[in-house]
Amino acid sequence: MGQQHGTRNGLTHRELPRGVGLLLAMALMNVALYLCLDQLFISPGRSTADSRRCPPGYFRMGRMRNCSRWLSCEELRTEVRQLKRVGEGAVKRVFLSEWKEHKVALSRLTRLEMKEDFLHGLQMLKSLQSEHVVTLVGYCEEDGTILTEYHPLGSLSNLEETLNLSKYQDVNTWQHRLQLAMEYVSIINYLHHSPLGTRVMCDSNDLPKTLSQYLLTSNFSIVANDLDALPLVDHDSGVLIKCGHRELHGDFVAPEQLWPYGEDTPFQDDLMPSYNEKVDIWKIPDVSSFLLGHVEGSDMVRFHLFDIHKACKSQIPAERPTAQNVLDAYQRVFHSLRDTVMSQTKEML
């Protein structure tokens, strides 16, 4: 009897920790899953980037701890090693280059008749340095060169090709894609309220051209890169803009950017009415639709964005929302869907 009593107590002593251990393991798994969910649905923001901003005239990139002064003409000529050409546009040719073991993008003016556009883009880069714009490393007006941080993932045009790679499958979700759309709208909002006044992204007459103006960073953020065509709208003085001097076609551009006098009247630039920053708002739904792609859940996001996108496509510019209005709507949808999915997931545990 004594032996049996001892055995019975021994079994109880061994079994109790097993049960407690199982409960503890399940609790830890739930905590880990909650943390993963919170990380997956992390709200978009660039506080880290903000804390790393340098004063005007200085830059920092990659693993640099301290800010350095923009490189001078002499430093660009002697310290930058040109590697290979990676792009070319109407104004400049771009080369992957190296500076002190940092990969950088060296832009060279290719046509002297485009120097005014080149210098305009440089002035915009210098004045609009922020988390929304590619980092300026140096420049030389005399040589027609601009040096910026290099982003190996390239322009937004490459987004689908990039996200289809197996190593990026974890970020190929509607959550991350919606965050990209929010960052795109944030850039438009920044340009419309920039330190240089209301600026319009004019190099955007079709979707491929628009996407080519932005770069995808290695941490899957978006920065504006090509600022050669950012005319100023001044509502107080009644100054409006026109994107170029040629007739525009298609439904990607806003209705007010189209020739209003019919096919029987030949296009004349001096007769073409001017317009304001609401042309950027018209294009947001098309760019966002591209960014959302066709992954699981992206159509659900489109459904929730239907009303704000419908407002963006108003034929009357004044009735379109502001970029801030659009951004607010995107954030509401993001948080609403995040809370819904997290709630459903936690209920399944």
Swiss-Prot record:
Catalytic activity, as annotated: 3-O-[beta-D-GalNAc-(1->3)-beta-D-GlcNAc-(1->4)-alpha-D-Man]-L-Thr-[protein] + ATP = 3-O-[beta-D-GalNAc-(1->3)-beta-D-GlcNAc-(1->4)-(O-6-P-alpha-D-Man)]-Thr-[protein] + ADP + H(+)
Pfam families: PK_Tyr_Ser-Thr
Principal subcellular localisation of the protein: endoplasmic reticulum
Membrane topology, Cytoplasmic segments: 1-19
Any one GO cellular component localisation term in the record: endoplasmic reticulum membrane
Lumenal side: 43-349
Protein kinase domain boundaries: 80-349
Membrane topology: Single-pass type II membrane protein
Taxonomy, superkingdom: Eukaryota
Catalytic activity, EC: 2.7.1.183
Disruption phenotype: Hydrocephaly: mutant mice exhibit dome-shaped heads of varying severity. Surviving mutant mice display numerous behavioral abnormalities: tremors, and inverted screen testing show 5 of 8 falling off, suggesting impaired motor strength. Impaired sensorimotor gating/attention is suggested by decreased prepulse inhibition, and impaired learning/memory is detected with trace aversive conditioning testing. In testing nociception, decreased paw flinching is observed during both formalin phases, suggesting decreased sensitivity to acute and tonic pain.
GO molecular function terms noted in the UniProt entry: ATP binding; carbohydrate kinase activity; phosphotransferase activity, alcohol group as acceptor; protein kinase activity
Glycosylation, residue list: 66, 164, 219
Gene3D superfamilies: Transferase(Phosphotransferase) domain 1
Record key words, sorted: ATP-binding, Endoplasmic reticulum, Glycoprotein, Kinase, Membrane, Nucleotide-binding, Signal-anchor, Transferase, Transmembrane, Transmembrane helix
Compartment(s) of residence: Endoplasmic reticulum membrane
Transmembrane segments: 20-42
Keyword Glycoprotein listed: yes
Protein's job: Protein O-mannose kinase that specifically mediates phosphorylation at the 6-position of an O-mannose of the trisaccharide (N-acetylgalactosamine (GalNAc)-beta-1,3-N-acetylglucosamine (GlcNAc)-beta-1,4-mannose) to generate phosphorylated O-mannosyl trisaccharide (N-acetylgalactosamine-beta-1,3-N-acetylglucosamine-beta-1,4-(phosphate-6-)mannose). Phosphorylated O-mannosyl trisaccharide is a carbohydrate structure present in alpha-dystroglycan (DAG1), which is required for binding laminin G-like domain-containing extracellular proteins with high affinity.
Family: Belongs to the protein kinase superfamily. Ser/Thr protein kinase family. STKL subfamily.
Protein name: Protein O-mannose kinase
Species assigned in the record: Mus musculus (Mouse)
